[in-house]
Swiss-Prot record:
Name of the featured protein: Urease accessory protein UreF
InterPro entries xrefs: UreF, UreF_sf
SUBUNIT field: UreD, UreF and UreG form a complex that acts as a GTP-hydrolysis-dependent molecular chaperone, activating the urease apoprotein by helping to assemble the nickel containing metallocenter of UreC. The UreE protein probably delivers the nickel.
Keywords carried by this UniProt record: Chaperone, Cytoplasm, Nickel insertion
Compartments reported by the entry: Cytoplasm
Organism: Bradyrhizobium diazoefficiens (strain JCM 10833 / BCRC 13528 / IAM 13628 / NBRC 14792 / USDA 110)
Keyword hit for Cytoplasm: yes
Pfam family, one: UreF
Coiled coil ranges: none
Family statement drawn from the similarity comment of this UniProt entry: Belongs to the UreF family.
Alphabetized GO MF terms: nickel cation binding
Task of the protein: Required for maturation of urease via the functional incorporation of the urease nickel metallocenter.
Length: 242
């Protein structure tokens, strides 16, 4: 039953909650948060060597496709579903989401990438940003949490709103992709920012789709990117772990 109240919302309390949520998101999804994202390229390293990515235009096109038709949308959807299951206290649903998210990863190195970051995110959250009930929700999953599921669980346990959490997560993922590419192509700082600007609409569109998606909407059509993550495993000279 929906409960309503005529009591006014205290603007000061609302501003404080919004500031606290923003502070947490900026901390958790900052490059300084030690989840090790800098050591992974999500297959971009192989794509650069193969000549698929050579400049800002080809990088922006590659990442736009990854966002809308590949791991970007899938990870965003898993984050949303994990957040909602955690918020509702649905441990069985969360376990199913965590297992499916892990199974959806297309290669061994991408599995290493997302599970190691997820584990680090949860470990640091427990140590420095703990929340009542977090341990129980993580334990209920009975499987290592991939990165987007870990972010969704922690954000929900802290009461950080879903929409900004999702946008911040996608921004962080895209920024890490661009950072990896900037070292490989290479790109200057200004060109890297130009790519980020070009992807602003794609990030927003991916987040909007994920917020209304269900697990039945999951799917990927980024065959070249998936192949890149597989071939990176045997790439002779590598800077990154994926």
């Amino acid at each position: 039953m929906l409960m309503t109240t005529n009591e006014p919302v205290n603007a000061g309390d609302l501003a404080a909650r919004e500031a606290a949520a923003l502070y947490r998101l900026m901390t958790w999804l900052s490059p300084a948060f030690p989840v090790g994202g800098f050591s992974y390229s999500s297959g971009i390293e192989w794509a650069v060597e193969a000549g698929d990515i050579t400049d800002t235009a080809t990088l922006a096109d590659w990442l736009d496709t990854m966002l809308g038709d590949g791991s970007g949308f899938c990870d965003a959807t898993f984050l949303v579903q994990a957040y909602r299951a955690t918020e509702a206290g649905e441990e069985t649903s969360l376990r199913d989401i965590a297992e499916l998210a892990s199974a959806f990863v297309p290669s061994r190195e991408r599995q290493l990438e997302t599970t190691s970051q997820g584990r680090a995110f949860i470990d640091i959250a427990r140590a420095a940003w703990d929340a009542e009930g977090l341990d129980a929700m993580v334990a209920a999953c009975r499987t290592p949490l991939v990165y987007p599921v870990a972010v969704g669980v922690v954000a929900a346990m802290h009461g950080v709103p879903l929409a900004p959490t999702l946008h911040a997560f996608l921004h962080a993922v895209v920024s890490n992709w661009i950072s990896a590419a900037s070292r490989l192509i290479p790109l200057g700082q200004t060109d890297s920012q130009r790519v980020l600007v070009r992807l602003e609409a794609a990030v927003a569109a991916t987040a909007t789709r994920a917020l209304s998606a269900t697990l039945d909407d999951l799917g990927s059509a980024t065959f070249r990117a998936d192949l890149a993550s597989l071939r990176h495993e045997t790439q002779y000279t590598r800077l990154f772990r994926s």
